[in-house]
Design a protein with these regions (language model features):
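Hydrophobic targeting/anchoring helices
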Residues: 1-106, 232, 244-245, 253-254, ...
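Short acidic/histidine-rich motifs immediately flanking catalytic phosphotransfer sites
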Residues: 126-131
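A conserved amphipathic helix/loop scaffold
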Residues: 108-109, 118, 122, 134-342
Length: 342
C-alpha cells in the first residue's frame, strides 16, 4: 500500500499535467486492513498509516470511518498538493533519446534511483555542461558531430558502456576506448568502499595515460591484480568524455558503495549546482526555483548530505520552516578533470 501512495506522490512531484489512478476498481473494492501497515511506520515517513485510517470528521460533527484503499489517494493527493505549489519546474541531467529507438532500456529509471535526476530529451541538448548519452543515441545521424561540438566548447559528455559497445568505430574517431565482450566480477571499489555482492560488468579497455579511471573496481581492487573502470575519463579538445560502466544487471547499480555514487553524482550534476551524498535508493528532485525534494526509497532511515555551490548558505524546510545550517566541506578524493592546453 505504501508503494501505491509513493507512486501518487512521485507523479505529483514530477509535475505531471494529468494523473490517472491505476486500478480504480481496487481502490473501491479492496478494504483497508492492518496488514497494510508496514514495519517502517513510525520512523518519520511522509505517509502515516495511522492518520490515514483515522475517522474523518465532518462539518456537522459526525465522523466517517475510512474503509477502502481510495482513502490512500485522498490523503496523498491532498498532502502533496500543499507542497507542489512551492516547487518550480523540474530540471535534471539531460539525456539524449531520439524518437523510436531502443538500447539501455529503462536505464534512466535506475539512474534516478541512485540520486541522478533525469531529463530525457528527443534532441541533443546544446546548452548543458554535461550531456548523458546511452545506447539509445546510437542511431542518431549527427551524434558524433554533436559530441565533438560539446567537447570542443569545453563541456563534457558521459556515455554508457552500452553506447561504447554499440558504436565503437564512431567513438574511436575521438578517443581510443573499447567495450569488449569480456566480463569481470567486481566487489571492491578501493577507497570508495565495498559492494554488498559480486557485480558482473563489461570490461572497458583503454590506453594508459590516454584515459584515467575516476572510479575503479576489482575483486579485490585493493591488493589485487586487476582493476576495471567504473567511471573513465578521456580528455578531448577542451572537454572530457566519460564512460560510465553499467553492470549486466542494471539493478546492481544499487549495490555501488555510497562514496562511488557520490563521485559519479558530482561529475554528472554540474548543470544543477547541487548533488547528493547518500547511499543508493535515494532520489533527488530539483526545480528551477532553487527548491528540491529528497526521497528515501530504502526501508530504513539513511544519512544524506546535500552538496551545493558556495552561493547557498542555508536550506529551509518548506513544510515546517526549519533552517538547515551548512556543514564543513569535505575534500574531494578523486582527480579533478584537467583541461588540456594546446
Amino acid at each position: 500500500m505504501d508503494r501505491y501512495a509513493e507512486q501518487l506522490h512521485l507523479t505529483m512531484l514530477a509535475k505531471a499535467p494529468e494523473i490517472i489512478l491505476f486500478a480504480y476498481n481496487q481502490l473501491l473494492g479492496v478494504k483497508l486492513s492492518p496488514r497494510f501497515r508496514t514495519p517502517w511506520q513510525g520512523m518519520g515517513t511522509s505517509f502515516n498509516y495511522d492518520e490515514m485510517t483515522a475517522p474523518i470528521r465532518q462539518k456537522d460533527g459526525t465522523s466517517i470511518e475510512p474503509t477502502t484503499m481510495a482513502r490512500i489517494a485522498d490523503v496523498v493527493l491532498k498532502q502533496t498538493d500543499k507542497l507542489i505549489g512551492k516547487l518550480g519546474n523540474p530540471i535534471g541531467i539531460k539525456s539524449y533519446k531520439p524518437f523510436h529507438v531502443a538500447g539501455d532500456d529503462f536505464l534512466q529509471n535506475y539512474l534516478g534511483m541512485i540520486g541522478l535526476p533525469m531529463d530525457i530529451r528527443p534532441v541533443f541538448p546544446k546548452d548543458q555542461q554535461v550531456v548523458l548519452l546511452t545506447a539509445q543515441a546510437a542511431q542518431a545521424p549527427e551524434l558524433m558531430t554533436d559530441i565533438r561540438k560539446q567537447l570542443q566548447s569545453g563541456r563534457d559528455v558521459v556515455i554508457t558502456s552500452g553506447l561504447l559497445k554499440a558504436i565503437p568505430e564512431k567513438i574511436a574517431e575521438i578517443v581510443e576506448l573499447r567495450c569488449t565482450d569480456l566480463k569481470a566480477l567486481v566487489n571492491d571499489f578501493g577507497r570508495y568502499g565495498q559492494a554488498g555482492r559480486d557485480l558482473l560488468i563489461p570490461q572497458v579497455q583503454y590506453y594508459t595515460n590516454d584515459a584515467w579511471e575516476v572510479v575503479s573496481a576489482g575483486r579485490p581492487l585493493t591488493g589485487g591484480v586487476s582493476g576495471y573502470p567504473i567511471l573513465l575519463r578521456a580528455p578531448y579538445a577542451a572537454g572530457n568524455l566519460y564512460v560510465l560502466t553499467i553492470p549486466d544487471d542494471m539493478g546492481n547499480l544499487y549495490d555501488f558503495p555510497a562514496k562511488a555514487l557520490n563521485e559519479i553524482r558530482r561529475i554528472m550534476s554540474r548543470d544543477m549546482d547541487i548533488y547528493l551524498e547518500a547511499p543508493s535508493k535515494v532520489g533527488l528532485f530539483v526545480y528551477d526555483n532553487k527548491t528540491l525534494v529528497v526521497e528515501n526509497f530504502n526501508d530504513e532511515p539513511v544519512e544524506v548530505r546535500i552538496v551545493t555551490d558556495d552561493e547557498v548558505t542555508r536550506l529551509e524546510n518548506l513544510e515546517n520552516g526549519d533552517i538547515l545550517a551548512p556543514l564543513p566541506a569535505e575534500p574531494v578524493q578523486s582527480r579533478r578533470p584537467v583541461t588540456p592546453k594546446n
